[in-house]
């Protein structure tokens, strides 16, 4: 086993602290950070979907991208590059989002939910690991979305520039955006505090290469578990924080913004894990890479935003359990998750060396 990378551990611990702190400051329970949920909220705020309870310009997303961008510029790691199957990456990003919203959370929120005692997230983790395992099998056999290329500075600057523009608009003309009056979208920390925390997290994630998918993938492929230590650090810090705040609740029922539709929790996160391996990283990692100038990751993020809009406009997202209803994933969402798995399989086969694709078939 390789030595512990303490930068990854420290970054994971700080992400965990940030998640607990943001919840204390107003973010929904077990949702101090969630890339899928926050991109979904931004899509709603920008009127891309009409779900009134999940609409808010989340400064955490802006901060993650800009924190990564600033750190990459300081360290000389900012590079404008792209051109690696952008349309395919857009589609993968959309289906990763659909899978995440069936489960009600990205891989980062899955870990945060585990730290809060939500055992539904354990089911999600099983599906997530299975999805990564499947993706790794294709990767080992030569799956590739082909190389990227050095591009004009403007290409790599698109997502950071969009985030700066979004921040300026939400400060100067907040009436342009929808903002939830109830539900998860109405629960948020102070914008400037959340932005500051996310800038720090984005910078640390850039330096440490923190990735929820990468730790499991690298462990399976190379026996290298150093990124997994960040995953564990987030869990332990969130667990300790919840115990200290008396907000830890072990079980399946009564969990915040969650449901116990186990088959679809598992399959939703299987789709997320598999799709993320093909993209080269989890949704958090895609944001960080986009901040570094990676246009392909920016396309994946835009695909996620489009996927969030589709999920809520067409009833694909899971419904959280309440005292009155069990919640879960409806028929439309189930069809979308199965379709997503089929699409990801087709993409996996289509981007393997021809002899390997023939064997897999």
Model-identified regions with their sequence ranges:
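Membrane-interfacial helix-loop segments of redox and metal-homeostasis proteins
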Residues: 1-361
């Amino acid at each position: 086993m390789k030595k512990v990378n303490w930068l990854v551990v420290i970054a994971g611990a700080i992400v965990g602290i940030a998640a607990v702190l943001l919840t204390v400051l107003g973010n929904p329970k077990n949702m101090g950070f969630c890339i899928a949920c926050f991109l979904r909220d931004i899509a709603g705020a920008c009127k891309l979907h009409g779900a009134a309870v999940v609409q808010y310009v989340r400064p955490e997303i802006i901060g993650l991208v800009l924190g990564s961008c600033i750190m990459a510029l300081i360290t000389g790691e900012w590079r404008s590059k792209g051109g690696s199957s952008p349309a395919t990456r857009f589609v993968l990003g959309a289906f990763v989002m659909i899978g995440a919203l069936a489960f009600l959370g990205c891989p980062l929120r899955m870990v945060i939910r585990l730290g809060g005692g939500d055992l539904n997230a354990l089911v999600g983790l099983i599906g997530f690991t299975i999805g990564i395992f499947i993706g790794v099998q294709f990767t080992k056999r030569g799956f590739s979305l082909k190389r990227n290329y050095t591009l004009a500075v403007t290409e790599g600057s698109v997502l950071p520039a969009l985030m700066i523009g979004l921040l300026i608009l939400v400060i100067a003309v907040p009436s342009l955006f929808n903002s939830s009056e109830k539900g998860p979208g109405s629960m948020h920390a102070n914008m400037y505090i959340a932005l500051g925390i996310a800038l720090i997290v984005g910078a640390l994630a850039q330096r440490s290469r923190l990735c929820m998918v990468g730790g499991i993938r690298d462990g399976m492929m190379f026996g290298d578990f150093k990124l997994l230590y960040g995953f564990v650090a987030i869990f332990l810090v969130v667990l300790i924080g919840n115990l200290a705040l008396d907000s830890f609740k072990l079980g399946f029922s009564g969990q915040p913004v969650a449901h116990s539709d186990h088959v679809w929790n598992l399959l939703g996160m299987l789709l997320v894990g598999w799709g993320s391996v093909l993209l080269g990283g989890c949704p958090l990692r895609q944001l960080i890479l986009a901040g570094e100038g990676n246009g392909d990751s920016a396309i994946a993020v835009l695909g996620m935003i489009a996927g969030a809009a589709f999920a809520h406009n067409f009833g694909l997202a899971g419904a959280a359990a309440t005292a009155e209803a069990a919640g879960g994933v409806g028929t439309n969402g189930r069809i979308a998750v199965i379709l997503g798995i089929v699409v990801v399989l087709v993409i996996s086969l289509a981007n393997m060396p021809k002899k390997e694709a023939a064997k897999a078939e």
